[in-house]
Amino acid sequence: MSIVVKNNIHWVGQRDWEVRDFHGTEYKTLRGSSYNSYLIREEKNVLIDTVDHKFSREFVQNLRNEIDLADIDYIVINHAEEDHAGALTELMAQIPDTPIYCTANAIDSINGHHHHPEWNFNVVKTGDTLDIGNGKQLIFVETPMLHWPDSMMTYLTGDAVLFSNDAFGQHYCDEHLFNDEVDQTELFEQCQRYYANILTPFSRLVTPKITEILGFNLPVDMIATSHGVVWRDNPTQIVELYLKWAADYQEDRITIFYDTMSNNTRMMADAIAQGIAETDPRVAVKIFNVARSDKNEILTNVFRSKGVLVGTSTMNNVMMPKIAGLVEEMTGLRFRNKRASAFGSHGWSGGAVDRLSTRLQDAGFEMSLSLKAKWRPDQDALELCREHGREIARQWALAPLPQSTVNKVVKEETSATTTADLGPRMQCSVCQWIYDPAKGEPMQDVAPGTPWSEVPDNFLCPECSLGKDVFEELASEAK
């Protein structure tokens, strides 16, 4: 089934609702994807790109329903990767002499995948044109390393449509083709996820290339991407976002991610987050256990953040494998304008945190002090973690801290007598979580100021879910 894009331009691509892994397992496509191919019918008929190789036969069959394959005058390949040019072998078996227009680097890539050097390749460079009749031309723009050396974009005059290749796309599958027809929150999330995980390493190239394209002073009524939606409603909004994201992007956000063997590093992460939130309530703090989280969501949050705290237990004197792998991906993504700190628990040796700090520095992060805890952190160690979070919040603040948090220590000291009147704090003997009467436990409707004696009998420890009977008076407060 084809979809009219504009005038004589039809979408003849393929939706892929089922795909969940892209580039091996490097990118999780939780909302599927699409492989966008476009058929232009003017005096000359032009096919722009094909689809992923696994849909080759379906693609050629569907294309034959749209047009006699022999009537295709030109094939344009903006990118030789298999999700763009994968159906070429199946198609060229039917029309072997059809001219293929692509960059010089694309010929190498296409031959590397399809092994047909006899195909009728025609090399194009930035500014080259191809007349397709009815007063319209294709204008080619090379975009090397966005995100392969062979990449280019193609602009159709008259209709003012930019076929943008991977740029401005998203791995997002929907029955609707146009940006104004889909859920805007989902669309924005997938656009940012796509940029953060795929195009971030090339941010230094994005701005000059967009500036070069804008310098042609060509109107852009639509941007037809290789994946996801076609931008027809205010199409340059995504261009503006790319310029913003390419400029060492950061929000007032801190991402904490960790892996843990015995829950100890998780306890540290929670306490650090508490310290950050106490000191700078404006900052968004996001916490992820890498063993239970989508790594591309973690990386998207790192992209958005001003800084990242990475935690690992020590195993065989090195960091946990999932942490090592994710930090390696962060190195490849080449994040800029971000700070980092390493933390973690250990037993008889603590080599992981030092190795992690070195790896983060090698990845281009501006490093802050690291933090270590031996075995399961007790109340004193957790307070050190909270203080570490407070110091991180102060060092990484993008603006002067709110006066209310600056004065918080003084207020806490003046309220010490009142807190003491509420009775002792109680500690879970299993996981060491502490109930503070002054704070209560809002998640279980236990209001601040509730003494332990008035806490309902059905109360459960928020950390290990055991009941009140495992709690003991905090040793430092026992009489």
Curated annotation (Swiss-Prot):
Please give the pathway this protein is involved in: Nitrogen metabolism; nitric oxide reduction
Q: Which GO terms describe its cellular component?
A: cytoplasm
One Pfam annotation reads Flavodoxin_1
User: Could you tell me which residues belong to the region Zinc metallo-hydrolase?
Assistant: 30-210
Q: InterPro entries recorded for this chain?
A: Anaer_NO_rdtase_flvorubredoxin (IPR023957), Flavodoxin/NO_synth (IPR008254), Flavoprotein-like_sf (IPR029039), Metallo-B-lactamas (IPR001279), ODP_dom (IPR045761), RibonucZ/Hydroxyglut_hydro (IPR036866), Rubredoxin-like_dom (IPR024934), Rubredoxin-O_OxRdtase (IPR016440)
Question: Residue limits of the Flavodoxin-like domain?
Answer: 254-393
- How is the co-factor bound, per the entry? Binds 3 Fe cations per monomer.
- Record's family? In the N-terminal section; belongs to the zinc metallo-hydrolase group 3 family.
**Protein name, please?**
Anaerobic nitric oxide reductase flavorubredoxin
Q: Tell me which species this is from.
A: Shigella boydii serotype 4 (strain Sb227)
Source organism lineage? Answer: Bacteria, Pseudomonadati, Pseudomonadota, Gammaproteobacteria, Enterobacterales
